Amino acid sequence: MALRFPRFSQGLAQDPTTRRIWFGIATAHDFESHDDITEERLYQNIFASHFGQLAIIFLWTSGNLFHVAWQGNFQSWVQDPLHVRPIAHAIWDPHFGQPAVEAFTRGGALGPVNIAYSGVYQWWYTIGLRTNEDLYTGALFLLFLSAISLIAGWLHLQPKWKPSVSWFKNAESRLNHHLSGLFGVSSLAWTGHLVHVAIPGSRGEYVRWNNFLDVLPHPQGLGPLFTGQWNLYAQNPDSSSHLFGTSQGAGTAILTLLGGFHPQTQSLWLTDMAHHHLAIAFIFLVAGHMYRTNFGIGHSMKDLLEAHIPPGGRLGRGHKGLYDTINNSIHFQLGLALASLGVITSLVAQHMYSLPAYAFIAQDFTTQAALYTHHQYIAGFIMTGAFAHGAIFFIRDYNPEQNEDNVLARMLDHKEAIKSHLSWASLFLGFHTLGLYVHNDVMLAFGTPEKQILIEPIFAQWIQSAHGKTSYGFDVLLSSTNGPAFNAGRSIWLPGWLNAVNENSNSLFLTIGPGDFLVHHAIALGLHTTTLILVKGALDARGSKLMPDKKDFGYSFPCDGPGRGGTCDISAWDAFYLAVFWMLNTIGWVTFYWHWKHITLWQGNVSQFNESSTYLMGWLRDYLWLNSSQLINGYNPFGTNSLSVWAWMFLFGHLVWATGFMFLISWRGYWQELIETLAWAHERTPLANLIRWRDKPVALSIVQARLVGLAHFSVGYIFTYAAFLIASTSGKFG
């Protein structure tokens, strides 16, 4: 018999039912579970797949550049970034008919096009790209990198070029390489690009390979560097009347500490960003020389961790045994990496709007909203993944003997206390926040809005004041006009910071009140509950009170009810599954809050948010209902407008989302019976019965159906909100 899919598992390949296909797909990337896997092949497969991942990323970014150069309007956008709408790419077949063709022909294009809400135009413009030729060059370069990555991935699977296990487990060398080689050198290279290409570009000087060696980025060249007069590089910065991309009002400084925003572009000063990247480069280049490799100098990670034993015995044996535990578990390493990346992605969301780095992006409201929402959802998925792999670590890799009485073992020892504290925090936040919202709802319904319970967030306002926001009237730190910090700030450091904090047109330290206080606690409820589910799933992965022997059941077993001995103290997979719903819910609140607050800020009617956000009906009526009207009118009896694609996506998103419930709220036996009925009818129908299948059709397993339901729920949820977000924002601000 020919080898059947999946080749990596002979047991599955011989399964006579359709389970073979679904389980094969589900375990295709679980290299550890494959038949003849060795530790060495496991590491080599993962290493090679990283190159494949890089190749896909480079190909994708190359495609962005290529399509904008081919079908976009980058050159005309550069002439007038505030009034020309950036085009992402052409649309082949706008739906439906001539009205749609006319509706989607915009941005100065000859035919129907999609508008770009990704911010790439602003990014490319800021870093010095100006022409379609520049974009094509970038696309070709990235295509070349993509090919190189593919070749490298293939090469490292060849016997001669396969790295050994010892190479993969050489943590110090990897740390040095990543700190110095990746972060340090790339930050230094980026500083170089900003200083040599982007900053001259922002001052109307076009630097390319042909004049790269002739144009001095600073009038004094490298002189100040060698004579120690570094302050000369900060003198004569761009003036507040500087027109970006021209020499009008431009200075000569390349590394500054101005603070605040460029008045015309509303983005951070390029010279501040160059300075920032130079500092980062310096720190990481130093950090990458700290660990002991071939030369016998520097720190040993293992020695550092073994020495970390807190005094007084309060944390037992501290970090003893952690080095080998982490270094020998790829799930632990992946969990740490995902946790870090998730936090960073969320920080990117928060900083991209409050401290915009790209010229004119702050005035492109739809792009701001899209980027914030995108990065928060990505962060949510990555963070939940961190806990999933933490749970797999406890099941597959954790060795109690190796970790006796260290911080890891002690987490397991007092997990009941951790769970109960998180549970208490979640219950407290949930009941109190809902109680306040519902009370306020009732007061408005009874026509007595003055009886609402409105709490000023005085601690948060105090923190904002300490950073220089004066409108609350706190006389503290940077908002205290006669304090030494305030006066020093005027001249020595970041003179533009205080102006930026107190100018109400940007998103830096938005004024907050009772509505913010309430939604902040609603979000805190979501965060704590999601964390509770995820932490419980990981800490109970090996065993729990009701089911002490989970380890041999593996990561994902179904809840089978009490009939077969009872596995209803859920599997670690089940915890991940439940947590994703909470994660989506929480980020829903986060994005609703961000979007509504900003819509009212951009429209100049902040009182709408302040007055309506203190009760639930306000959110439903004045945010969701009010802002969905343009969207729902994408198609109407009079024809089609340019929001019709979002109206369609909004409907389609609801469809996908609702389909999820078919898999989530259902009995497996119902599907099994339905499938057998259909198979029976098929086999007895003329013509149809000529077509046979090799695998006996069976219903999805409980875990599989949950996964399919979860995938539909997530995708539909995000499609629906993305359509709402883009249509409601672009419908208002064009």
From Swiss-Prot:
It is found in: Plastid, Chloroplast thylakoid membrane. HAMAP family: PSI_PsaB. This is Photosystem I P700 chlorophyll a apoprotein A2. Chlorophyll a B1 binds at H654. It holds the Pfam family PsaA_PsaB. The gene is psaB. It is an enzyme of class 1 (oxidoreductase). It comes from Chloranthus spicatus. GO terms for molecular function: 4 iron, 4 sulfur cluster binding; chlorophyll binding; electron transfer activity; magnesium ion binding; oxidoreductase activity. Its EC number is 1.97.1.12. One of its GO terms (biological process) is photosynthesis. Chlorophyll a B3 binds at M662, Y670. Belongs to the PsaA/PsaB family. Phylloquinone binds at W671. The chain crosses the membrane at residues 46-69, 135-158, 175-199, 273-291, 330-353, 369-395, 417-439, 517-535, 575-596, 643-665, 707-727. [4Fe-4S] cluster binds at C559, C568. Keywords: 4Fe-4S, Chlorophyll, Chloroplast, Chromophore, Electron transport, Iron, Iron-sulfur, Magnesium, Membrane, Metal-binding, Oxidoreductase, Photosynthesis, Photosystem I, Plastid, Thylakoid, Transmembrane, Transmembrane helix, Transport. GO terms for cellular component: chloroplast thylakoid membrane; photosystem I. The lineage of its organism: Eukaryota, Viridiplantae, Streptophyta, Embryophyta, Tracheophyta. It catalyses: reduced [plastocyanin] + hnu + oxidized [2Fe-2S]-[ferredoxin] = oxidized [plastocyanin] + reduced [2Fe-2S]-[ferredoxin]. The PsaA/B heterodimer binds the P700 chlorophyll special pair and subsequent electron acceptors. PSI consists of a core antenna complex that captures photons, and an electron transfer chain that converts photonic excitation into a charge separation. The eukaryotic PSI reaction center is composed of at least 11 subunits.
